[in-house]
Each structure stands twice: as structure tokens, then as C-alpha cells.
Regions:
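Residues in the helix-turn-helix
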Residues: 32, 43, 72
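Recognition helix of helix-turn-helix/homeodomain-like DNA-binding domains
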Residues: 38-54
């Protein structure tokens, strides 16, 4: 029987990747998100590929369109230490 590496308990995700993941989980295309936010599809693509910074104002607009808290987008790797210590 072959040996397998143990699964990672945590995966590091960039800000852009978090935008893409949440958008895709909601079944939205970049064009659909662009329509909801007024942010161009090209800019959304650049954000998702970490070519430009998300920024606070864009984070608020995108979070509203994706129905999530802006912190979910801005701090994708954040972990509540109080919960994880138990």
C-alpha cells in the first residue's frame, strides 16, 4: 500500500483568491459581479489575480455584492485564536 501525505489543515489564500473563491461559490461570473458592483470585469480579473490591490472601498462594494463581510475578503487567512486554542 502506498503512503500518502497528510492533508493540510490550513491553506494560505491571497486576497484575490478569496474574492474568486467566494464569487465562484455563489455561481457568479466576473461579468455578473461587474454588473452588480460597477467595477469593470478587467479590474475584477486583476484583483483576483493579485495584480492590483483590493482596497477598502472596493472591498466594501464587492462584499456587499457577494453578501459577505469585507473582512472575509481583506483578511482571508485570519483565524480567531480564541476558538482555535480550545
Amino acid at each position: 500500500m502506498s503512503q500518502f501525505r497528510p492533508a493540510k489543515k490550513r491553506v494560505d489564500v491571497s486576497v484575490g483568491e478569496s474574492v474568486r473563491i467566494i464569487r465562484e461559490l455563489q455561481g457568479l461570473s466576473q461579468n455578473q459581479l461587474a454588473e452588480r458592483t460597477g467595477i469593470s470585469q478587467a479590474t475584477l480579473s486583476a484583483i483576483e489575480n493579485d495584480r492590483i490591490r483590493l482596497g477598502v472601498e472596493r472591498a466594501k462594494v464587492i462584499a456587499r455584492a457577494l453578501r459577505c463581510h469585507p473582512a472575509v475578503l481583506v483578511f482571508p487567512g485570519w483565524e480567531d485564536r480564541a476558538d482555535s486554542a480550545a
